[in-house]
């Protein structure tokens, strides 16, 4: 056994008594060379009705040993098997079907049987020296949402381990990510999920993975050998370690809000109906839109989530958590997770989707909805206010907004620019979705314009802006306009307060051929179009320079609401004659002495198809961004109190 791990676990348990209780509840398999202990928390199981079966194979064959577990108190059942069982497999059965348990840490192929492993054997060389990349504030993060398979499955990727964890350890992949400048990867589900058959990997299969089966085991289809329980664990750790060495944090997509199904789930086969919410009519509630919703407010489900988060931090060195449909979970549980994580490392960032996918069987005011985020200190949420102000409403792919040159969402964008805080110059009555500020500090807002859900940015722009697909316009002109609008969209994201987030591949104008939700689309839709790096080199260069500009200038990364209100002031949109102009938003970051090398910054977004003039504080300025080009050393100089902003572009000026 790993003595260092045991010491750390003991110290952590002494600090976190709640977690210790959870460890006792969910530590279902304890291995040593001399014996293996099995414990299952199954409160509703009848007398002598819990069976454990041992197998020599992770999928095939009959059990070579079957044991009746003995009751240990009111809720737990136990059994001890002498001898070295490493390499064997097991299942529990309370009469509802075999299960590897609720908290299996290793499994056979397809996750139907638990695996007996020594986790120390899964640590790659140097794992004990792996270090979490440092950040001073969540605002320092540049989050890159990535699907493991998408990144490398195309033969044009030039990577050896196509579609695998190990692709992210290859020098070419690491160099690409470092060159782009991102410092955090939010991986779409990497836990063991049910929607890909790991025994049929010779056939192309794709799924996003929001179909949880075993929450605490890495997905096997991304490993080089899903039949080997330790391989997926070790290769996942190798990926994490390689990214950490490159200065890139790893964020886990936590999908605790539902399971793939109910009757076949490990929860249901261990403690029937406990882990799920039901309606007043006795039906399973479906706030997830996936057929069920879990009951985070129940003590055992809350303990499970706490212990699972802690396990991914301790065993896999995870640096952050994105909670899928966070609005299904209760506020108290989410705050308990934040407080526990703070005691481990407060720099571990937690954020989520502040909504559900349907009505939940729990009071809305007690759920971790975006509107309740002010009660979740230190937990972020996605700003759909900002997203839809730019691209258009989620309900209609073909309807545009500011990026289409359509007025009406200027205040919604301004609300996103300040990071979702209360600001005297933001008229909340004109904000699209929220009429009250929902963050305490800008670091609780995820600023973005697209993610894996719905159309990717390029497809959405083409669907909502007719000129981008009008064959009467030359392809050269359509491409030039697409580039302008795409760059303008991301400039809004990266020069706003909050935590910037992009969908992986957007830096190369990735598209998904117009597919609205590509959760089970083939690789031809989801894979990176690596040839685009040669086709649109200016896109990658712009993204890279935009990311670096944000990293170089703390003024775009203010960490508190008070600092934003003190330093960020919106500019009037009227022209020199006092006429109001639409689709034009500008602001200044002022009095930046001691904060930024640039003492005064002006940022203007022009969503119109015509050049616009805007009034600015009179002075001499250096141009850092203009017409889709960024150069912090300066593209030229401007003097006076009025500037021209090119069509569909951003202008960034500064004074030293």
Language-model features: where?
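Bacterial Sec-dependent N-terminal signal peptides
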Residues: 1-24
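The feature marks proteins involved in alpha-glucan
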Residues: 23-37, 68-145, 150-163
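Carbohydrate-binding surface patches
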Residues: 34-44, 570-617
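Conserved, mostly hydrophobic/aromatic
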Residues: 40, 92, 146, 187, ...
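Beta-strand-rich binding/interaction modules
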Residues: 40, 46-59, 63, 611-628
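C-terminal beta-strand-rich structural cap/linker in extracellular carbohydrate-active enzymes
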Residues: 42, 86-90, 635-656
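Conserved alpha/beta catalytic core and glycan-binding cleft of carbohydrate-active enzymes
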Residues: 114-117, 121, 338-339, 347-509, ...
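Substrate-binding/active-site clefts of carbohydrate-active enzymes
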Residues: 147-171, 175-316, 329-345, 349, ...
């Amino acid at each position: 056994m790993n003595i260092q791990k045991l010491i750390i676990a003991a110290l952590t348990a002494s600090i976190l008594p709640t977690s210790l209780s959870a460890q006792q509840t969910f530590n279902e398999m304890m291995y040593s060379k001399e014996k293996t202990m099995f414990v299952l928390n199954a409160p509703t199981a009848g007398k002598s009705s819990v069976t454990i079966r041992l197998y020599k194979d992770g999928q095939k064959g009959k059990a070579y040993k079957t044991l009746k577990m003995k009751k240990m108190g009111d809720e737990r059942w136990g059994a001890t098997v002498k001898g070295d069982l490493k390499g064997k497999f097991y299942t529990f059965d309370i009469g509802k079907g075999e299960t590897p348990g609720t908290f299996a840490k290793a499994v056979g192929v397809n996750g139907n049987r638990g695996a007996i492993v020594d986790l120390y054997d899964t640590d790659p060389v140097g794992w004990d020296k792996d270090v979490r990349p440092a950040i001073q504030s969540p605002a320092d993060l540049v989050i890159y949402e990535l699907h493991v398979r998408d990144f490398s499955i195309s033969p044009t990727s030039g990577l050896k381990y196509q579609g695998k964890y190990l692709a992210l350890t290859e020098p070419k992949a690491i160099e690409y990510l470092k060159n782009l400048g991102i410092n955090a990867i939010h991986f779409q589900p990497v836990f063991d999920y049910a929607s890909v058959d790991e025994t049929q990997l010779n056939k192309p299969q794709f799924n996003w993975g929001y179909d949880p089966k075993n929450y605490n085991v890495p997905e096997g289809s991304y490993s080089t050998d899903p039949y080997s329980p330790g391989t997926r664990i070790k290769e996942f750790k190798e990926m994490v370690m390689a990214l950490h060495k490159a200065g890139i944090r790893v964020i886990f997509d936590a999908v605790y809000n539902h399971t793939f199904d109910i009757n076949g789930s490990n929860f249901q086969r261990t403690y029937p109906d406990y882990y799920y919410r039901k309606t007043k009519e006795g039906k399973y509630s479906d706030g997830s839109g996936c057929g069920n919703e879990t009951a985070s407010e129940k003590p055992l489900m809350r303990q499970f989530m706490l212990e699972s988060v802690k396990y991914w931090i301790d065993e896999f060195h995870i640096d952050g958590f994105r909670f899928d449909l966070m609005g299904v979970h209760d506020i108290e549980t989410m705050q308990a997770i934040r407080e526990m994580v703070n005691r481990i490392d407060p720099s571990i960032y937690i954020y989520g989707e502040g909504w559900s996918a349907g009505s939940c069987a729990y009071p809305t005011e007690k759920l971790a909805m975006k509107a309740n985020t002010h009660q979740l200190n230190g937990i972020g949420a996605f700003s759909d206010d900002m997203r839809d102000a730019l691209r258009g409403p989620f309900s209609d792919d073909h309807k545009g907004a500011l990026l289409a040159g359509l007025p009406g969402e200027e205040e919604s964008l301004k609300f996103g620019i300040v990071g979702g805080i209360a600001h005297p110059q933001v008229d909340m009555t004109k904000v699209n979705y929220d009429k009250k500020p929902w963050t305490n500090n800008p670091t609780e807002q995820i600023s973005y314009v697209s993610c894996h859900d719905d159309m990717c940015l390029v497809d959405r722009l083409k669907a909502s802006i007719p000129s981008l697909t009008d064959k009467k316009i030359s392809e050269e002109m359509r491409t030039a306009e697409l580039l302008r609008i795409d760059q303008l969209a991301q400039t809004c994201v990266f020069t706003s307060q909050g935590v910037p987030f992009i969908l992986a591949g957007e830096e190369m104008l990735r598209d998904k051929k117009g597919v609205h939700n590509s959760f089970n689309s083939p690789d031809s839709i989801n894979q990176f179009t690596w040839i685009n790096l040669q086709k649109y080199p200016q896109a990658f260069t712009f993204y890279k320079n935009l990311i670096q500009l944000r990293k170089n200038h703390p003024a775009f990364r203010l960490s508190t609401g008070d600092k934003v209100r003190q330093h960020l002031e919106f500019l009037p949109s009227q022209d020199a004659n006092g006429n109001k102009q639409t689709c034009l938003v500008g602001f200044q970051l002022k009095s930046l002495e001691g904060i930024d090398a640039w003492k005064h910054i002006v940022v203007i977004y022009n969503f119109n198809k015509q050049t616009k003039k805007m009034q600015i504080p009179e002075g001499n300025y250096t141009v850092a961004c203009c017409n889709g080009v960024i150069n912090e050393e300066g593209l030229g100089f401007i003097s006076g109190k009025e500037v021209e902003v090119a069509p569909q572009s951003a202008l960034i000026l500064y004074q030293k």
